[in-house]
Each structure stands twice: as C-alpha cells, then as structure tokens.
Amino acid sequence: MSLGLVGRKVGMTRIFTDDGDSIPVTVLEVGDNRVTQIKTDETDGYTAVQVTFGTRRASRVTKPLAGHLAKAGVEAGEVIKEFRVDAARAAEFQPGANISVDLFEVGQKIDVQGVTIGKGYAGTIKRYNFSSGRASHGNSRSHNVPGSIGMAQDPGRVFPGKRMTGHMGDVTRTVQNLEIAKIDAERKLLLVKGAIPGAKGGQVIVTPAVKARAKKA
C-alpha cells in the first residue's frame, strides 16, 4: 500500500478549462496529516506510517490515546489511520511530522475511499432498481413487493445473496482512478474530477491509484 492522506469531503463544484469546458469536481480538504507513530518490522511485525487528521477536544480523548499522542507530540485528531509502506519510505518520516497536499500532483490518478450516504431501510425498488407491479387490473395489494423469493419444498430455502429489502447505504466504498484536476496548496484542498462516495463533511482516504495506467508517449 502507498502512503496517502486522510481528509474530509467538502462538496462538489465545477471548474473551467482554458477552452471553456466545464469539469465537475469534488473538493477534498486534506489538511496536515500529523504522524503519530512509525511502525517497524522489529517492534510491530510490519512497517507503516500512522497519522491523525482533524481536531478533537481533550475531553473526548481516552487516556491511553492521549498518552500515545503526547509521546508523538501531536494534537488529538478525529481519526487515526495507518498506511502500510516499505521500510525505506517509512524512514523518511518521524513522529510529529506533517504530511500535506504536496504528496500529490495535478493530473495524478488516485483512489478515494469513503462511506456512502445511509438511506435507512429500503425496498427492492429503491435498493436494487426493481420494477414495480401493476397499478391496477387485478393488483390491489402488491404494487411494490419484490415477488417470489424462492421455490417450493425443494430446495426449501432462500438462496444466499437473494436481493431483498434491507438497509441501504452506509458502507465503505472505494472509487478508483480518479484524476486530480487542481491543487490549492494554500487552503490544502484537492479538486478531484468526478464524484466521491459520502456526504458533505464525511471522512475520506486518498491514496495513489493501484491500477493507474502509464500514459502512452
């Protein structure tokens, strides 16, 4: 895994190219990610860079976590995240260091992970785009039901994976190969082409794309 940044989704807007083309972009706030720990093979069995992002009141921090952050000399954040890297990459950082938007560049392909917007308990029409039943002509009570969910005594069960009503949204999703359209280093913002899962203010994890294709010469 490559080193990345933890951030927050600000919302969507558009930017215009020199040719006048409109590009829809998602604005991500990726302020300073403060390094809280460097994990090594000798002490932890693997190498990683642990960071925190955002701010949190001291009254909301547990004593073990407060001690962990104090040892690194960093302010408490909303979340702690690890990025597994090789030993050489991990050796470039020390606890207390800041990692910012200069980790990325305009035009770079990235993967963005977020938690989708929760929709609550949803029916099959909303959840899986099922078609509804007939509005009339003999149909009086089953307009939006999914229909049959199985067969008879054989097999006598509902097969796993059957699409039915249930909780929709609020799941972790990763969108791959998004392109960075613009970087605002002063305000620590990334403007990314396209949509990103999650609500405004939701936490996101930005990493270099794992499936990025090299540009042809």
Curated annotation (Swiss-Prot):
The keyword Ribonucleoprotein applies. GO terms for biological process: translation. The keyword Ribonucleoprotein applies. The gene is rplC. SUPFAM superfamilies: Translation proteins (SSF50447). Part of the 50S ribosomal subunit. Forms a cluster with proteins L14 and L19. Keywords: Methylation, Ribonucleoprotein, Ribosomal protein, RNA-binding, rRNA-binding. GO terms for molecular function: rRNA binding; structural constituent of ribosome. This is Large ribosomal subunit protein uL3. The modification N5-methylglutamine is found at Q153. Residues 133-153 are annotated as: Disordered. Methylated by PrmB. It comes from the Bacteria. Belongs to the universal ribosomal protein uL3 family. It comes from Ralstonia pickettii (strain 12J). One of its GO terms (cellular component) is cytosolic large ribosomal subunit. It holds the Pfam family Ribosomal_L3.
